[in-house]
Amino acid sequence: MRILTIILFLMLVPCFCLSQMKTGAFSDLETSQKGNPKPIIIHIYTDWCSVCKIEKYNLSKDKELIKKINEDFYFINFEAEKTKDKINFLGQEFNYLPNGNSGIHELALALSKNKSQPVYPLWIVLDKDKNLIYYHEGEFKPEKMKAKLLEISAL
């Protein structure tokens, strides 16, 4: 019985791993782009954003979308108010801007069209050369995201 339990466990573990979105970091982007250039998806969110949590749950259920993102894009999840690391991106250095007990990262402000207070969640898609090709504020429903990413992949 114990062996059967172990075998079943080992069979199920890959299923959970295969359905997860692969996320990267800005620090790895330059190396990744040199070896295998792909468009880049930057997802900017905060941990207090309820829309962000709903969106994350809905996206995690769409295995086809996760597969598309993992195969054809580099995906960066960026927590705008908790990320305190210095980030070099597009030839510039961006830092965390503390403001009392909280703060925001300069990169979130730089990528947002609303420079005073970004809207969360924020989705930015860059081409292989890091040019902006799509910008989306607010919830990005899986069906709309799939259609947009298919359109971008066809470019």
Feature map (PLM): residue ranges:
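Bacterial Sec-dependent N-terminal signal peptides
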Residues: M1-K22
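N-terminal leader/targeting and pre-domain segments
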Residues: Q20-N36
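Thiol-based oxidoreductase modules, predominantly thioredoxin-like and allied folds used
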Residues: K22-T23, I66-S102
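Short active-site neighborhood of thiol/selenol oxidoreductases, capturing the structured segment around
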Residues: G35-S50
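Structural recognition of the beta-strand scaffold that forms the well-ordered cores
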Residues: I40-H43, F75-F78, L122-V125
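C-type cytochrome heme c attachment motif
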Residues: D47-I54, L122
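Typically the conserved alpha-helix immediately C-terminal to a functionally engaged Cys/Sec
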Residues: K53-N70
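A short, hydrophobic beta-strand/beta-hairpin element that forms part of a small beta-sheet core
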Residues: E106, V119-Y135
